[in-house]
């Protein structure tokens, strides 16, 4: 997938799910399933419910995404 095809949105983590998946509510009100990107996983950044995050989504599947940044 090319970098320009990615949709970036901000949201809030609602719940943690098994297999490092998270339920995220986007700013526009939609809820999606998101997994953690490799850079966040390598640096052992903890993501907890209530955290504000940036999510990358593919235009082909708008129900899933990848968490790329956790705001402090």
UniProtKB/Swiss-Prot annotation:
Listed GO MF terms: ribosome binding; rRNA binding; translation initiation factor activity
Compartments where found: Cytoplasm
PROSITE patterns reported in the protein's UniProt record: S1_IF1_TYPE
SUPFAM superfamilies for this protein: Nucleic acid-binding proteins (SSF50249)
Any single GO CC term annotated in Swiss-Prot or TrEMBL for this entry: cytosol
Keywords: Cytoplasm, Initiation factor, Protein biosynthesis, RNA-binding, rRNA-binding
Residue stretches making up the S1-like domain: 1-72
Superkingdom field: Bacteria
Family annotation (PANTHER family): TRANSLATION INITIATION FACTOR IF-1, CHLOROPLASTIC
Family listed: Belongs to the IF-1 family.
NCBIfam families for the chain: infA (TIGR00008)
Annotated function: One of the essential components for the initiation of protein synthesis. Stabilizes the binding of IF-2 and IF-3 on the 30S subunit to which N-formylmethionyl-tRNA(fMet) subsequently binds. Helps modulate mRNA selection, yielding the 30S pre-initiation complex (PIC). Upon addition of the 50S ribosomal subunit IF-1, IF-2 and IF-3 are released leaving the mature 70S translation initiation complex.
UniProt subunit comment: Component of the 30S ribosomal translation pre-initiation complex which assembles on the 30S ribosome in the order IF-2 and IF-3, IF-1 and N-formylmethionyl-tRNA(fMet); mRNA recruitment can occur at any time during PIC assembly.
Name of the molecule in the record: Translation initiation factor IF-1
Native species: Staphylococcus aureus (strain NCTC 8325 / PS 47)
Source species taxonomy: Bacteria, Bacillati, Bacillota, Bacilli, Bacillales
């Amino acid at each position: 997938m090319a970098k320009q095809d990615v949709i970036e949105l901000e949201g809030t983590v609602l719940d943690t799910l098994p297999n490092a998946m998270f339920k995220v509510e986007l700013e526009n009100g939609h809820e999606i399933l998101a997994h953690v990107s490799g850079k966040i996983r390598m640096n052992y950044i903890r993501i907890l419910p209530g955290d504000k995050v940036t999510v990358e989504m593919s235009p082909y599947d708008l129900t899933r995404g990848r968490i790329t940044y956790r705001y402090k």
